[in-house]
Design a protein with these regions (language model features):
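A glycine- and Lys/Arg-enriched "phosphate-lid" helix/loop adjacent to the NTP-binding pocket
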Residues: 84-128
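The conserved Walker
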Residues: 1
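ATP-dependent small-molecule kinase phosphotransfer cores
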Residues: 22-71, 76-82, 109
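Short glycine-rich anion-binding loops that position phosphate/pyrophosphate groups of nucleotides
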Residues: 69-72, 93-95, 143
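NTP-dependent small-molecule kinase module
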Residues: 11, 15, 125-163
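Walker A/P-loop
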Residues: 6
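Post-Walker A helix-loop "phosphate-sensing" segment adjacent to the P-loop in P-loop NTPases
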Residues: 14-23
């Protein structure tokens, strides 16, 4: 949630010369705006669409996949990601997320039009057990996008992970 996953993912994919997949964009292309799906069909249906998009990306050519912040809350998504992908958590503190959300023009369905630190912390706390099981965690609080991209690329190289 507002950790910069899409921006980082695009830049990392470009640096590595691989394809980039944005799961939210894939869902929007197939089913319409995220907020419309949440309001008309509910979060559970959105998570199913998200899972389908994740599977489609995993079945395509290798690359970088940017997930929505809540993707790993859906058990099937987490299961397939654990089995078929390397998972990187870009860890940004809730206060920084709040600042980013306040500057954003996108309304996040689980946060609402007026983001609050308490709501962000509530979601963050609920999701943290799933985030913390990532293969790699980037403590990104004081890092630029370029630094985060470089750190992930270095980790991939060190682990001899080829995409």
């Amino acid at each position: 949630m507002a950790a910069g996953k899409s921006t980082i993912g695009k830049k990392l994919a470009r640096k590595l010369g691989v394809k980039f997949y944005d799961v939210d964009d894939m869902v929007v292309t197939e089913h319409g705006p995220v907020s419309d799906i949440f309001y008309a069909q509910g979060e559970q249906q959105f998570r199913k669409y998200e899972y389908e998009a994740i599977c489609k990306a995993l079945d395509s050519e290798p690359g970088i996949i940017a997930l929505g912040g809540g993707a790993v809350t859906y058990d099937e998504s987490l299961k397939v990601l654990k089995k078929r992908a390397y998972r990187v958590f870009v860890k940004v503190p809730p206060e920084q997320i709040l600042g980013r959300l306040r500057r954003s023009h996108t309304v996040r369905p689980l946060i609402g039009a007026t983001p609050s630190l308490s709501k962000i912390k509530e979601l963050y706390t609920a999701r943290m057990p799933r985030y913390s099981h990532s293969d790699y965690v980037v403590e990104a609080q004081d890092m630029s996008t370029a630094q985060v991209v470089d750190q992930i690329a270095q980790w991939l190289h060190k682990k001899n992970i080829k995409l």
